[in-house]
Amino acid sequence: FRDMISEAERRRQQGFRLFRVFPHLQGWQPRIAPFRTFLQWLNEQGLPLLVDCPQVGWASELAELTQGSSAPLILVGVHEGNLGEALSAMSACPNLYLETSGLKQPDGYEMVAATVGVERLIFGSGAPLHYFASALLPLLHSSLSDEEKRKVLVDNLRRLVQA
């Protein structure tokens, strides 16, 4: 974690508009102090962050850590086991977004859109670890309008990285 902010600043100066972290693979918990410092820097820069959120409790922690922040935080890898928690956290924290690679329920897109709005969904496939079609087909076969599907596939992420 040493020099994390200066490293991120160099990447920002190179044109990076989005960052990603993998706490469960990197062996740390979202509540650690260096991550809070990184979140504060991202908020000051107005930069979005993708953060893996595969464990129950992490969406709640991330919501608490970003309370009052305006920088978008995109929850990645949310699945049936923690989707309810993620939606509750998103309802309380308007800067949280949901990446869709773990959204496998038949009515998953409709349920999330009805709960927090289609504008908070960011398409993700999980590729190359997962088949692209297994993430795309539930969206294409959902009852969302073509305009809403376009928001999920392209427009929502574009809006966040161009802000």
Give, region by region, the residue ranges found by the protein language model:
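C-terminal active-site rim and adjoining tail of enzyme catalytic domains
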Residues: 124-128, 132
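Mid-to-C-terminal alpha-helical segments outside catalytic/metal-binding sites
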Residues: 133-163
